[in-house]
């Protein structure tokens, strides 16, 4: 039991020391990278949303053009 506690304590101490070895500069750099990536994701999301409205407008125009063609085709058949 004492040996288990000793090993467990050593593992906890070792992990604490390893966590303390990371520098603040590296953490700040990673945080900055994450913020940059989040900004890019937001921009891409906005671009996709803008394209959705453009695609919908193109679909609507195509549907109107097809309807006009269908109307012309029925006039020629009569």
From Swiss-Prot:
Annotated coiled-coil positions are 27-75
Q: Where is this region: Disordered?
A: 56-78
Q: Name one GO biological process term.
A: lipid modification
Identify the domain of life. Answer: Bacteria
Q: What triggers expression?
A: This gene is probably the major expressed form.
* Signal peptide region: 1-20
* Residues in sequence repeats: 24-34, 38-48
Quaternary context:
Homotrimer.
Q: Which NCBIfam families match?
A: Ala_zip_lipo, PRK15396.1
Q: Output this protein's name.
A: Major outer membrane lipoprotein Lpp 1
* Source species taxonomy: Bacteria, Pseudomonadati, Pseudomonadota, Gammaproteobacteria, Enterobacterales
């Amino acid at each position: 039991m004492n040996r288990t506690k000793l090993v467990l304590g050593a593992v906890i101490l070792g992990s604490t020391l390893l966590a303390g070895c990371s520098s603040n500069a590296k953490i700040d750099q990673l945080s900055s990278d994450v913020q940059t990536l989040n900004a890019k994701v937001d921009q891409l999301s906005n671009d996709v949303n803008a394209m959705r409205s453009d695609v919908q407008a193109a679909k609507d125009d195509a549907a109107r053009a097809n309807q006009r063609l269908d109307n012309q085709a029925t006039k020629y058949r009569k």
